């Protein structure tokens, strides 16, 4: 209790994932402070197990040199640990900042490069994740089987793994995802059966979803999400649904900006006079053959897409409808990144 570790150089932990070899481990303690310390060549950086009200601040953390991503440990790992503050850490060549069965934690103003995921929660609730920036990882932020958390003002750039995302929600309910920027990722937002809990809503508002391969990918939708005031710009595909029978019609859309919107604004109120409609054409080739996205923008693919819209071979399916699409980006400054 009340241990303070400040201005330390900590190097050379063991390599056992089973034993959770770490630079610093806290077991059933309270009020630990780890500040302004450097962790190098450690499997796990800081490991909190039933450790509450810790402050992990201003540290430089990297994992074992030469280890590929699955063999690395987490920069910070919280297990059944609550009310902790994890802020202003620089994390690189590590795995995740992860919280398992941990609630009421604040994870903010951390910076990371070349990790696996940025922030990862499992079976956790009531956490605040804000003002973090991560780039070059295999994935972005992952929230799995978690509830009632606020995720705001984060920047996720160039998540380039096979399933690279800005943010992924897996069986996650009651989330507020707002004012984030998802840029140059394989997917900006991935929603997998989220929300899960009946009667809950995920609110996704005022985010910048920019220049991703897919802006929004939906899987097995069963409950409503609300999409409000987001900017979809430069994405190869604005949105897709990969699960027939999903209840995507439950989702609500309003006040979003879509760079492919072709409507007019005769009364100049900044809102399009006709709804933005996004259809899925069964003959749109890369819905079924993702490798064809390599040829996006080519003359042949552009021609096929034009013909599909002009004379589709099958009835298109409506994926989303925004009745009040914006004519200009909601956040023009960020949209020019």
Regions found by a protein language model. Name each.
Residues 13, 51, 64, 94, ...:
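Flexible loop residues that form catalytic
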Residues 160-162, 166, 175, 188-197, ...:
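Functionally critical loop-and-helix segments that line ligand-binding/catalytic clefts
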Residues 2-108, 113:
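Right-handed parallel beta-helix
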Residues 17-26, 41-44, 48, 68-79, ...:
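Extracellular beta-strand/beta-solenoid scaffold signature
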Residues 54-56, 65-67, 84-86, 95-99, ...:
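Extended, compositionally simple hydrophobic/Ser/Thr-rich segments
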Residues 2, 7, 31, 43, ...:
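Detector for repetitive beta-architecture
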């Amino acid at each position: 209790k009340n241990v303070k570790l400040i201005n330390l150089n900590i190097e050379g932990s063991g390599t056992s994932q089973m034993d959770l070899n770490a630079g610093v481990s806290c077991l059933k303690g309270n009020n630990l402070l780890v500040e302004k310390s450097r962790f190098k060549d450690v499997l796990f950086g800081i490991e909190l197990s039933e450790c509450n009200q810790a402050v992990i601040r201003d540290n430089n953390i990297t994992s074992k040199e030469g280890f590929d991503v699955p063999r690395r440990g987490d920069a910070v790992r919280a297990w059944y640990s609550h009310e902790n503050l994890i802020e202003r850490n620089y994390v690189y060549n590590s795995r995740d900042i992860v919280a398992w069965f941990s609630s009421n934690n604040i994870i903010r103003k951390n910076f990371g490069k070349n990790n696996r995921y940025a922030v990862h929660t499992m079976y956790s609730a009531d956490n605040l994740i804000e003002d973090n920036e991560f780039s070059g990882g295999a994935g972005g932020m992952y929230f799995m089987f978690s509830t009632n958390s606020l995720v705001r003002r984060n920047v996720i750039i160039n998540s380039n793994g096979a399933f690279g995302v800005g943010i992924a929600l897996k069986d996650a309910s009651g989330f507020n995802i707002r004012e984030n920027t998802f840029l140059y990722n394989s997917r900006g937002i991935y929603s997998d059966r989220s929300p899960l809990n009946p009667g809950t809503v995920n609110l996704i508002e005022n985010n910048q979803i920019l220049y991703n391969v897919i802006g929004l990918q939906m899987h097995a939708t069963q409950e409503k999400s609300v999409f409000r005031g987001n900017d979809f710009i430069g994405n190869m595909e604005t949105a897709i649904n990969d699960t027939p029978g999903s209840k995507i019609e439950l989702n609500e859309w309003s006040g979003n900006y879509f760079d492919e919107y072709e409507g007019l604004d005769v009364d100049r109120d900044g809102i399009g006079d006709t709804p933005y409609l996004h259809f899925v054409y069964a003959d749109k080739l890369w819905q079924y053959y993702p490798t064809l996205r390599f040829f996006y923008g080519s003359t042949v693919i552009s021609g096929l897409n034009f013909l599909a819209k002009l004379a589709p071979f099958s009835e298109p399916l409506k994926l989303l409808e925004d009745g009040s699409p914006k004519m200009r980006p909601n956040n023009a400054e960020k949209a020019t990144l």
